[in-house]
Amino acid sequence: MSQSICSTGLRWLWLVVIVLIIDLGSKYLILQNFALGDTVPLFPSLNLHASAYYGAAFSFLADSGGWQRWFFAGIAIGISVLLAVMMYRSKATQKLNNIAYALIIGGALGNLFDRLWHGFVVDMIDFYVGDWHFATFNLADTAICVGAALIVLEGFLPSKAKKQ
């Protein structure tokens, strides 16, 4: 039985495009205006810091000789396809899940673009307290984390709210 894309979660794919535009635009601006390693303080505890990142979160596989680029690219493609299928199978009215999936897909594709185009992921947000610095990250990473948090939140909502 065929169903209209607008009646499925794929209706929310526009959010993937928004995430990609914002993420890739921010990375473009960083690469055009900063040398890798440059840091500019924005606020207390927040810097812009242009960096090339070869691994995954918290330096996972960062020094593995290059093969991890393709490994993480495959993961990004696989997760994006899986979530797109889940969006297709869900109703457009299941907003929270579909927004979460779209944020994760947008973030995954933003970092995938970096890995394929540059050979590394461009990170620029440096949050710190005193001398302790959190791992530098980008807007794609933020979209992925917000999407994951929404999925967790959805799990705690009563079933009536899940259908909204």
From Swiss-Prot:
Q: Keywords assigned by UniProt?
A: Aspartyl protease, Cell inner membrane, Cell membrane, Hydrolase, Membrane, Protease, Transmembrane, Transmembrane helix
Per the UniProt record, one Pfam family is Peptidase_A8
Q: What's its EC?
A: 3.4.23.36
- Compartment(s): Cell inner membrane
Per the record, the major location class is: membrane
What's its catalytic activity? Answer: Release of signal peptides from bacterial membrane prolipoproteins. Hydrolyzes -Xaa-Yaa-Zaa-|-(S,diacylglyceryl)Cys-, in which Xaa is hydrophobic (preferably Leu), and Yaa (Ala or Ser) and Zaa (Gly or Ala) have small, neutral side chains
* Membrane association type: Multi-pass membrane protein
Q: Where are the transmembrane segments?
A: 12-32, 42-62, 70-90, 102-122, 137-157
GO cellular component terms, alphabetically, are: plasma membrane
Q: Which GO terms describe its biological process?
A: proteolysis
Task: Look up keyword Zinc-finger and say if it applies.
Answer: no
- What does the record give as its pathway? Protein modification; lipoprotein biosynthesis (signal peptide cleavage)
Read off the NCBIfam families from this record. Answer: lspA
Report the protein name in the record: Lipoprotein signal peptidase
